[in-house]
Amino acid sequence: MTDLTLKALAAERQVSVDRLVQQFADAGIRKSADDSVSAQEKQTLLAHLNREAVSGPDKLTLQRKTRSTLNIPGTGGKSKSVQIEVRKKRTFVKRDPQEAERLAAEEQAQREAEEQARREAEEQAKREAQQKAEREAAEQAKREAAEKAKREAAEKDKVSNQQTDDMTKTAQAEKARRENEAAELKRKAEEEARRKLEEEARRVAEEARRMAEENKWTATPEPVEDTSDYHVTTSQHARQAEDENDREVEGGRGRGRNAKAARPAKKGKHAESKADREEARAAVRGGKGGKRKGSSLQQGFQKPAQAVNRDVVIGETITVGELANKMAVKGSQVIKAMMKLGAMVTINQVIDQETAQLVAEEMGHKVILRRENELEEAVMSDRDTGAAAEPRAPVVTIMGHVDHGKTSLLDYIRSTKVASGEAGGITQHIGAYHVETDNGMITFLDTPGHAAFTSMRARGAQATDIVVLVVAADDGVMPQTIEAIQHAKAAGVPVVVAVNKIDKPEADPDRVKNELSQYGILPEEWGGESQFVHVSAKAGTGIDELLDAILLQAEVLELKAVRKGMASGAVIESFLDKGRGPVATVLVREGTLHKGDIVLCGFEYGRVRAMRNELGQEVLEAGPSIPVEILGLSGVPAAGDEVTVVRDEKKAREVALYRQGKFREVKLARQQKSKLENMFANMTEGEVHEVNIVLKADVQGSVEAISDSLLKLSTDEVKVKIIGSGVGGITETDATLAAASNAILVGFNVRADASARKVIEFESLDLRYYSVIYNLIDEVKAAMSGMLSPELKQQIIGLAEVRDVFKSPKFGAIAGCMVTEGTIKRHNPIRVLRDNVVIYEGELESLRRFKDDVNEVRNGMECGIGVKNYNDVRVGDMIEVFEIIEIQRTIA
């Protein structure tokens, strides 16, 4: 082998020359860039690198590269594109467990030693401060008592001298008597002075004792758990007690300086060192300078004797940092408290109200929960709904399995042809109609029966009073029939069963009754509560009996609603019309909806600019149980949202914006954060193929149903990802999104506009139009099946029995065989079986018949077989020849 130069070896290994030189030096080989490297030196370097890899710590390096395009505007209105590449690299190192335990033990020992030293220093300072405070208090009491006694004695002497002068001016006859009175007065005055002196001394001693107790209480820190917030040390308390007398002597003279001293002192040892420097300078100056000792800067903050409990006001959501500010503690303490509760958070993470309440109460604070929807409640309560309730028409939902004749039954009742207008003859929207009969008005909701429209059927059951369950007499109970029964039971509404297609020869209504009885739907003649009516939507049989049964059930329910006042209702369906804007189909429940009313509908609001009934006719008002289409909303509301008429458009806008913000905050608060464990789990899963789809449909319910159906198709190998979805035609924005994400554009009953078609043609995007949900789901299944890896299957094509063994100088042992089954083909994989046990698996190398090489030998013929790299062939062995075929898998 030709020796490589070190520079060529570095290029081959994709490392720098300097690093390779260093690696050779570490391995004990001195090389330069131009030296040649022999094979022995390569082996030495490889052994050295393997030793380092084994002895070094386990490392995992993750590299990520992201490319994007930035458009920069230039001169002349032109813009240029700049390619931006962001590279990220992270390395995770696994520590040695023994080293980690040793470091943890050293840190624990150091913390315990520091804690012990701190406790001893605090106790020593506390004892010294207490003794000094008691001495100062006793000396002060003695000085005050002595000074007061001297003053009172001087006053008594002065009074005695005045009395003596007066005696000399009076008559000599009264002198003796007055001397006796003066002596008596002097004795009483001395007793009174002594009594007052004793009382004063007792009072001063009591005051000194009380001051000593206060100083002792102040200097002793309470065993509060978190004391690091206040940064007040015991030495500062001792200095404060030492200078207390000096501050009292200074009085008003030092007030100005004390005001400056009340500023917050610096924390930690810097504050102590500054105070020590001030005292040292005062001691060096001496004389008058010493008097300024009492005005040195002191910490003006008094440490609370116990933890301060606050009233913490918490809204719907709050960040960890805001919660810490409300409790006047550090954010790290809140994070520590949440870690004890089992939640790992950051200081900027949003948490919900329940979590914040739990943390605040755990830290000893009182929680006040703030209702952020006060404006919404005020707007909802300010409605005119005080009128009396009147009887209203029932709302009836037609439910059942697909193709059981729900829409055809409703067609006959309405005497129109609605089913022919639906694509594929199946209902894909909720239709709302009201019908005038001889006995009164009935409002019908026609729901889809296809399996994809589960949420639509659930909404129909929630908005209804009576459910008409349509079951085909020739088909019986089907999966969507069972689901409709469950929706009706969940909504708590009565069920009227319409057994349809009774005119068919194979109709069996008794079978329908037996099957429905298994799910709790019993006919009245069997002692149940459900009415069974035999109808035929084609011939019109039993339609009048069905309407009578519906009205009878409505009379039993005694349905009433307020007809006068501000209306409220529910959105049955919504879509975006190109000419009219957002359109919502609303079923009025209470009150009367007028043209021009201000409505609040979920995240949207607006003024009703126009109303149309199900026939497309303009109407000015709609009462209870009447379905109408309204125009004028700010956006397309979600199907199922509550519609409420309010007084003030400005307040309606504020409530709608608040709901949007609240929805976003709650979504962010509950969003799961990706953890390191999940990252490693995703790495082990391997590559998962994704089918990206941008979905646009004509109504909100179809978007919801198609999205749910497509997401349910996902498997472990291929996943469906809805990149974007919405109501309305395919726009240029949708096409750009599909191009950026390599997605399929799917339009359900909508088309692409001119600008979108240009982008689609330029980017060669895959655009597909559908009008039936069956076809859409089937084609997405086919696209997903193409991404599945094929299944490999082994198929046995021939079996030969070894009758004799020959030796060949070229191929070794040659088995003389008789083909007993199938065909033996050359160069196919084989298995050698001995006593029906596989002992070798390899390849058929040589196949001969009468010394001629052949490609295959059929059943019943003799041949010679040479097995590649195998010579242990014995008489009686079986040689099994098979081939591997690929089977294309499909999504079930």
UniProtKB/Swiss-Prot annotation:
Segments for region (G1): 400-407
GO cellular component, one term: cytosol
Protein family membership: Belongs to the TRAFAC class translation factor GTPase superfamily. Classic translation factor GTPase family. IF-2 subfamily.
Function: One of the essential components for the initiation of protein synthesis. Protects formylmethionyl-tRNA from spontaneous hydrolysis and promotes its binding to the 30S ribosomal subunits. Also involved in the hydrolysis of GTP during the formation of the 70S ribosomal complex.
Matching InterPro entries: DNA-bd_dom_put_sf, EF-G-like_DII, EFTu-like_2, IF2_assoc_dom_bac, IF2_II, IF2_N, P-loop_NTPase, Small_GTP-bd
Matches recorded under PANTHER family: TR-TYPE G DOMAIN-CONTAINING PROTEIN, TRANSLATION INITIATION FACTOR IF-2-RELATED
Region described as Disordered: 88-305
Domain tr-type G: 391-560
CDD domains: IF2_eIF5B, IF2_mtIF2_II, mtIF2_IVc
Biased composition (Basic and acidic residues): 93-159, 166-216, 270-282
Protein name, entry field: Translation initiation factor IF-2
Renumbered residue ranges of the record's region G2: 425-429
Keywords, alphabetical: Cytoplasm, GTP-binding, Initiation factor, Nucleotide-binding, Protein biosynthesis
